[in-house]
Every structure is written in C-alpha cells, then in structure tokens.
C-alpha cells in the first residue's frame, strides 16, 4: 500500500548540554524519537515502522531526506547538482564531459583521490571500483521519490566506500500517474523526461525515459545522453511478500573543453584550448536487480537484494599543451547481494526492541587500460590491468528503547577483502593485501526529554582500503598493508520550538589512521600514503514555514582538516590542510506561493576558497556565492510552466587544481555563466 505523506522539516538532533535549557519551556511541537530531517514529500511503503528492515531514519543519527517534490523541477544537467539542497554537502564541478562532477561531505573532497561516500540506487551499491559515483548520472530528477543522505560513521549496514557516510537515491515505486517534463534553455539545452506508473491489485509497474542534449557554456562542451528504466513488483493478496525486478540503461557521449590557465579562465571563461579539440568521453552503464521483502512471522521480516552492474567508460583527455593526450578505458562488471533479517519481539521490560542481522557481498571483475594518444589515435599502451576485487561483510545491530524518550542503537560490522591482480603488459600476477578481518563497532543514542527537542550522539568506525592496483602487493611493496581506520563521533540537537520552525545544530569529528590517496595521473594506478588525518566541523540548519504560503531554509557547515602525521614522502604536509576542502559551505532560500497558481522562489549557495595541494603553498581558489530565481505557474490541474534563472549576477566561479607535471601551476575549469531555463510539466 502506498501512502503519500507531506513531512515538514523534521530536523536533526542533539547538541551540547548547554542548549538544553533553551527548549525546556516549550511544549508546542510533537515529540520526535528520531534524529532525521525530512524536506518535501516522501512515499512510504506500507508500515515502515512496524515491519521490514529497520529504517534509516529510525536507526541512524545523522540523516537528511530530500523529497521528490523539491527535486523534480530543479534546473540541473546532472543529478549530483541536486545535492545543492542537502546540508553540508560539497559539490565539485569538474565540467569535463562525462567527468562532470561529484559530491562529498564531512571534510572529504571530491577530487577522486579519496572517495568517501557510498552510493546506492534503490538500495543497490553503485560505486565504481575507485569509489567514484558515475552510476548517479543514470537518475534524472523526475524519476526520484527521495534522496537519503547519511553522514558520519555510525551506519553498520554498509562497509566498502562508507568512509564518511552514504547516499541512497530512491526512485518511484507504484502509483498511477503519467508525468512528462520538457525543458529548454541556455546553451541550447534540450531535455525530455517521461515517467509512467501503473498500479493494480497485485502488480506495480514503473517506466522512465529521459533524453538530454546541450552545447554547454564553454566551447567544445557538447553533451548527449539518455536513460531508461523499468520496475516491476508483485505483491500477493495476503501481502506476505513483495518481489520485484528493476532494470536500468544509460548512455552518454560528451566533449571535454579542458582546463585553462588562470589568465585565460578569467578573461575568456567560455574558451577551449586547441589541443583539447579531440578530447571527449563515452560511457555506457547497466543495472539489473531483484528485490524480495517478506514477513516470515508477526515478529520476523526478511529482505534480500541481488544485482548486476556493468560500467563501460572511455575517455580521451589532455591536461596541458606539453602533456600527451591519454586514452583511459575502464570496464567493470559487479555482481552481489545484500540480505537482512529483522526480529521485533515483545520484551516486557523494554518499551520497544528490535534486532537486525545482515550480510552482503560484491564481486568485481575489472579491466583498466591506458594509452598515450594523439587526436585519439593510439601511440603506445601505458596500462593494461585486470583485477578481481571481492568484499564480504556482515553486521548486527539492535534498536533498544528502555523507555519512550530514549533510543540506543549498538552495532557491530566486519568486512573481508579478497582478490587477485594481473599486469597484462608483463604477464605477472599479484595477490591482494591481506587486510584481515576489518572490525567496526558503532553506537548511537537519541534522547528526547522534551516534546520540542532531541539530543543525539554517535560514535563509529569505518575503513578505507586501496583501489585499483593499490589494493595489491605489487613490488617494491611485498608486505601486507593494514586498512586505514576511521573513527568518528558526533553530538547535536534537533529542535522544533514552534510548529513553524525546526532545525539542527551539531559538532562532529573524524580521524583516519593511515589515509591513502589515489595517484590520478599515474599509469601504475598506485596510491600515496597521506598519513594520519583529522577532520572536524559544525553543521547548522534552520527551516521556517510561518504560513501555508511561505517556506524558508538556511544551512551552514563549517569544516576543517589537518594532516597530523604525514607520510615520509611529503613531510612538509605536517599540520597542513587537506586540499580542496573549503572551510564554509552554505545555502539558503525562500519559496512563496504568491497566488494559488503562482509560486516564486529564490535561493543561493556558496563556499569559501580551498588549497590546491597538501603542502598549501600554491594559493587558494574556488570560493563563490551564486544567486538563483525561479517561478512556477500552474495553468491547469495537469499543466504547469516554470522559468529558472541560474547565476543571476553572472558571477565568475570555477573549479581549480594544481598540475605538478605539465603546467606546474593551477589549472582552471570555469563554471556556467548566467543561464535561463524554461520548462513545461504535464501531470495526468
């Protein structure tokens, strides 16, 4: 059974005990036993509290949920841009064809050297081997029902890539609807999205198709992509189980405009370099999964998923005029399964209790090739690697409520890594590092002593291991490496002092025992040891809805990073900041229903500068503040039109990195200038 619920911002939790007195006097809002914050409308499948696996919002302490209604009309070219609305999320806009950008949080950057966020699509693991998130591009806004963002180290359900947290993108399941969205705008951007839902007594069907093309803000930046998916789920008359199949396919081809010198970027931001004329990328991805949820008894529920992911990526790129063009090819096949068993017995001496155990595995078959090229013609091969990378994990977690206002969630997870590596250029085979059994204890507590506030705290351990060749014992390295252990904790307060206000304030910290960083431009595929690191920061969020016509939001994140004990290869990085981590991230906005048919909105987002490398000697770049406007007019019950103006002030902003090999200077990728997009949404 599908139930559409409108959830006002259920803010996030706890804070130092100093703040306790601020909320003790106000009993206006309903008590909240979770620390999750929800924005927008989310589809609830059945009785998510009383049955099935433990929900993300009820178990974990740092959760943000974005509803589909605030996502479906956002003017974005890639889904990672949707996370502008999520608090504390850093967006890294490469703007290089198929390598368009990515998300990160908790003081980790989006460079691709340390990929600290696990991506799931409808609960299916969707990172590539290196931890990047190309599968996110498969999802378009109109297909989404919600996005869950879990920040921190307390989630025991996932192991690999779950260093700083995870993101789960849920698409529409069930419902009777026909939706279409057409969009046209600056840089000859053209987009079509079609979504269809069919719900019968036992079967639900969901279909989606999207096509987008654009010339891009910069020269030599054309992109063309399409995505399609189907979901088929069956539930018998007695509702004892639900069985489903999900299939997705995505293809794209895009030109790369390349990186510019600082002078060219500021004076001619839309230009490209002559040597980038043949740079481009192609990408093809597939995802197939089977889902089963069943009630074995009144107190026992079982959930299982099995899946197959394929990733086919080819890219030609040249970073500087004196550097060679490279062809980078990646072919990955992933298959795996996840399962959980949830027991909800009646324990007379507890207010509530649930126990959940789960296990998962993923097996990867990967090929990584690189060539030195000229105008995409191969001159020499520089990499030919084939490697298996397999992970096996299990966890146990309990939800214990001694009384109504206190929830305690202890958890424990273990992971094991296996695999093998072959260098096809030499014919030599290598074993994977024996990381041992990676043990990860966790504990979360939520205390709600008043109806207007919840205090929360959590502590947890996650891990990082090498990716690509760095996961294997390849000479001169012949001894096993230990995983980098990440210990993190957080405390905060979630508050609702009135019916029209809610928010969250939190402090967090995370330390890594031996962080490793991928060498992105090295044909060997190896990594560098960054060393012992610490990250910490504050998060704040406030949501206001003073009347039925007005919504306002404000989020702010302060984050800091430091290298405590560097590796011997870069001793001058001791005490320095990790690169590409801005200290401040913020976004704010207002939505106003001017008339029953007309909605007006304005929003801004920004960040401060960051260092380009770990010794912090090459200056700081990347800060910006962008202003945006929007208007939506409902012509009829089934037709609405909208107009979106991005970067209202035509502000220059950029992504920058330091090239130590070719330019030996900062290279720049300018962001889009002022842009206008118009859209028509049909809802039948």
Model-identified regions with their sequence ranges:
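Membrane-embedded beta-barrel scaffold of Gram-negative outer-membrane proteins
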Residues: 301-317, 448, 454-460, 483-566, ...
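Extracytoplasmic beta-strand/coil segments of soluble accessory domains associated
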Residues: 55, 84-124, 128
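Transmembrane beta-barrel wall of Gram-negative outer-membrane proteins
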Residues: 184-213, 218-257, 280-297, 407
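C-terminal beta-signal and adjacent terminal beta-strands/loops
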Residues: 606-613, 632-684
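Gram-negative outer-membrane beta-barrel transporters
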Residues: 343, 404-408, 416, 507-511, ...
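N-terminal periplasmic "start-of-domain" segments of outer-membrane beta-barrel proteins
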Residues: 40-74, 100-102
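Face-selective signature of the C-terminal outer-membrane beta-barrel domain
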Residues: 240-250, 282-425, 446-448, 497, ...
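Short acidic/polar hinge/loop motifs at secondary-structure boundaries
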Residues: 124-151, 169-171, 480
